[in-house]
Amino acid sequence: MTTKIKTQWTCTECGTHSPKWLGQCSGCLQWNTLVEERTAPKLNTSSYSSSSSIPIPLNNVEFQEEIRIHTQAQGWNRLLGGGTVRGSLALLGGEPGIGKSTLLLQISSQFAAAGHKVLYVCGEESVSQTSLRAQRLQISSNNIFLFPETNLEDIKQQIDNIAPDILVIDSIQIIFSPSLSSAPGSVAQVRETTAELMHIAKQKQITTFIIGHVTKSGEIAGPRILEHLVDTVLYFEGNAHANYRMIRSVKNRFGPTNELLILSMHTDGLREVENPSGLFLQEKIVETTGSTIIPIVEGSETLLIEVQALVSSSPFSNPVRKTSGFDPNRFSLLLAVLEKRANVKLYTSDVFLSIAGGLKITQPSADLGAVLSVVSSLYNRYLPKNYTYTGEIGLGGEIRHVSHMEHRIKESIIMGFKGIVMPFGQIKGLPKEFLDQIDIIGVKTIKDAVRLLQ
């Protein structure tokens, strides 16, 4: 009896299935994202399936620490939680041209220099193109094997032949399995090829890196299950026209998340930035209104970032509120609190807020700096010079506690700032050494903070 082929419609954004075409996906509510897929019913293997594993009491499980591969790139080791775990699968996403292939080729050279075999599957480029990039990056190694292939079965054959320690897939959207009838890059292909690569990585203990393209919204293209399958998800951030890039770990089964690695772009590749705060503050104008410096904590890194605001009279009945690098919904909430609790009128003004350097901030500790930048620009008055600002703002206008306060103060001292404005309630528990090295101003409410304007 021939196997009956079924047709279903799958969302390219979230992977939701539907028996018929819909204009709007019922899962993620996106429009025109459903594509047709043909699937054969799965075989019923329950009659002959077996398992060699049995349930084990938790107290009887023998602990085995993960084997990690270290490179000379200390920032990369820190990003992955202390080195790359053998047999792990990591997904690196980013916009086209931002430097994903360049980075992984450099990391491959680090692994190769340590004596590890690397199989680099360059499906999007020819061997000569990848070789030219390697020459530009001054990379030369007999331990890196280039393989321009997109067929998963051929890739598996070369894995058996070469037995690599490291596998790089560039990119997952172009790899296809001949057992599926759908086109490369489709939801089914991305899901199944990633699942197969995960199985190979775990079975053969091959550390695998796969490159994924991102959608217009900045998320990795393909079904959401792609991020659930892998062990680590890294996002390449930053402006493709700027001379630095940022890599953020948003998922890591073997280490902390939200680690941030900042790299500078040079003719011979990407290099780690030793002093990120100095990089973001090097172009700051000393005497200007509407500007504050905030300390933020990204993983184990503490950075000082400039927040810039511009407030101008609006010629329209509906004023404009725009942000860059700051959550627009959070910003609207802060402006409402500012008007209600501090009596700062903004309903006739256009308000713009930008995080200098292209960094994206999601932590609430940036609230105080953002609000004071707006008030400073509105009144065209200066804030205290050489101070940093940190604190979360509640709906009642209170300045709430933030985490890692000692790290924020320490970074402010290192960068030469003479004072910090912070929640009043956190001053009491600070070490005495901080009180001797930096001026600390505590504020209880947003109204207290506004009074700091000269």
Curated annotation (Swiss-Prot):
Region (Lon-protease-like): 350-454
Listed name of the protein: DNA repair protein RadA
Keyword DNA damage found: yes
Function field: DNA-dependent ATPase involved in processing of recombination intermediates, plays a role in repairing DNA breaks. Stimulates the branch migration of RecA-mediated strand transfer reactions, allowing the 3' invading strand to extend heteroduplex DNA faster. Binds ssDNA in the presence of ADP but not other nucleotides, has ATPase activity that is stimulated by ssDNA and various branched DNA structures, but inhibited by SSB. Does not have RecA's homology-searching function.
Organism of origin: Chlamydia trachomatis serovar D (strain ATCC VR-885 / DSM 19411 / UW-3/Cx)
NCBIfam families, A to Z: sms (TIGR00416)
Family note: Belongs to the RecA family. RadA subfamily.
Annotated zinc fingers (C4-type), start-end: 11-28
Biological process annotations from GO: recombinational repair
Example GO molecular function: damaged DNA binding
